[in-house]
Design a protein with these regions (language model features):
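ATP-binding/phosphotransfer module of carbohydrate and carboxylate kinases, centering on a glycine-rich
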Residues: 1-78, 82-156, 196-197, 263-267, ...
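Phosphate-binding/catalytic loop of phosphoryl-transfer enzymes
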Residues: 102, 116, 156-275, 389-416, ...
Length: 444
């Protein structure tokens, strides 16, 4: 099992040790070790840090003092006395900077502002307006600034994470195609947000972000090998292998909507939907419910599951039919990837055991190696929390780079975080020159 804290590790640039053998580089690398140890353990004494990091007490004391000056650590009281002098405790300054996670959907855009410990400070939800790429990107920029409005005293923005529907080129930050957002093809979302806010930006597929969210805070917490399956308007999967999202050679991994479960239908063109979404996507289920229920139903999926619970025969048959198709798809995925856990989420997946129990029966019949199959623990927040985590990882790199490069205090500023009155921009690490930063000292 992976360490529960692993998702938030500071980035250790071991190559820097090879490139730069000079004492200054080594001291900065040791400072990163100290920051990571303090963040993992919470309040800790300098003596305990020395034991945990295997650094000498004088070196730890000097590094801690410098990190306190930088604003990355603070003294928070004294340890319980064991008979001698009580040791002063230090803790990580989570409000050194903040991040924004964004869940971009075809109907809503959701935002979360969090400190560097991952604690959510503010949230915002708004309907997705005009789906044209330029208009949506303008809406996101306005949404971020609105999120900051009224947040007096908040630290500067350090990083942004966005979960977008459809295929994404994570390396370049491009949304290759989003079937549920009209006109979205090769949209350079990362470049636009980086230019506007002058901070690093992470872009990924929304289902991959949901997998990250479950890995960080949900029912897949600490499990390095699992699959998150999103069932809703679309059907997709986020695949975690050895603690890393698997995206494939062309960013196509997890596009399970194109799984074909009937060999006689391989010639049929199911379009951008694919076979699986054509049969068990939200629109397909609603159509089938309207046909089967006739005058008894209005096509609403929640009404379908409610009717099945109440013993409506047609509704129960349809739920079993949907679960069977999904069960065969999950069985194929399990046979191929051998995950320890399958998490089912999305709007339809959130119905829970009513869908999962018949789905499990199919998987148990087909597959000899049985994974756990669970409903999402985060509900509709999985994508949003995954976006926050992706931003936190970038923020940790920014903090590490500031130490390694001998920069000033990084993102920290004494001025309140509000949109700049002249430009409307949220201040970030790329706009340090507009702010009075804390007094800093080079690491010893």
């Amino acid at each position: 099992m992976a360490d529960d804290n692993a998702p938030l590790d500071f980035e250790h640039d071991h190559s820097a040790t090879i490139r730069k053998i000079d004492p200054t580089a080594m001291r900065r690398l040791n400072a990163i070790r100290i920051l990571d140890a303090v963040r993992r353990t919470g309040p800790i004494s300098r003596a305990s840090l020395a034991k945990r990091t295997h650094l000498s007490p004088p070196a730890v004391s000097a590094l801690v003092d410098s990190l306190i000056t930088r604003g990355l650590l603070r003294e928070v009281g004294q340890d319980v006395s064991t008979g001698g002098r009580r040791a002063t405790l230090v803790s990580f300054v989570a409000d050194y900077g903040c991040v924004v996670g964004i869940d971009l959907g075809s109907t809503t855009v959701r935002y979360a502002l969090a400190d560097l410990s991952g604690q959510v400070l503010a949230r915002r939800t708004e309907p997705t307006g005009n789906p044209a790429p330029a208009r949506v990107m303008q809406q996101i920029g306005t949404g971020i600034r609105t999120l900051f409005s009224g947040q007096a005293g908040r630290p500067p923005l350090v990083a942004i994470g966005v979960g977008a529907p459809g295929m994404t080129d994570v390396r370049r930050g491009i949304v290759i195609e989003a079937a549920n957002l009209r006109g979205w093809k090769d949209v350079a979302l990362k470049d636009v947000l980086t230019r506007e806010f002058a901070v690093p930006v992470a872009i990924d597929n929304d289902v991959n972000m949901a997998a990250l969210g479950e890995y960080w805070l949900g029912c897949a917490r600490g499990e390095p090998n699992f699959v998150f399956i999103a069932l809703g308007r679309g059907v997709g999967a986020g695949i975690m292998i050895d603690g890393r999202i698997h995206r494939g050679s062309q960013w196509y991994a997890g596009e399970i909507s194109h799984l074909l479960l009937e060999h006689t239908r391989w010639r049929r063109d199911f379009g951008s939907q694919g076979y699986l979404e054509h049969h068990v996507g939200a629109a397909a289920i609603a159509r089938a419910w309207r046909r089967q229920a006739q005058s008894d139903g209005d096509g609403d999926i929640s009404a379908l599951f409610a009717a099945a619970r109440q013993g409506h025969l047609a509704a129960a048959r349809l739920v079993t039919h949907v679960a069977t198709i999904l069960g065969v798809a999950v069985a194929n995925i399990v046979t191929t990837l051998d995950p320890a856990l399958v998490v089912v989420g999305g709007g339809i997946g959130q119905v829970g055991e009513q869908l999962l129990e018949p789905l499990r029966q199919v998987v148990e019949h087909v597959v000899p190696n049985q994974p756990l199959i669970r409903a999402t623990a985060l509900g509709g927040d999985a994508q949003l929390f995954g976006s926050v985590l992706s931003a936190l990882r970038l923020a940790n790199r920014a903090v590490s780079d500031a130490i390694l490069d001998g920069a000033g205090s990084g993102a920290h500023a004494t001025q309140a975080v509000t949109p700049d009155n002249r430009s409307g921009r949220v201040p970030g690490i790329g706009s340090r020159q507009r702010h009075q930063t804390r007094a800093t000292a080079r690491l010893p």
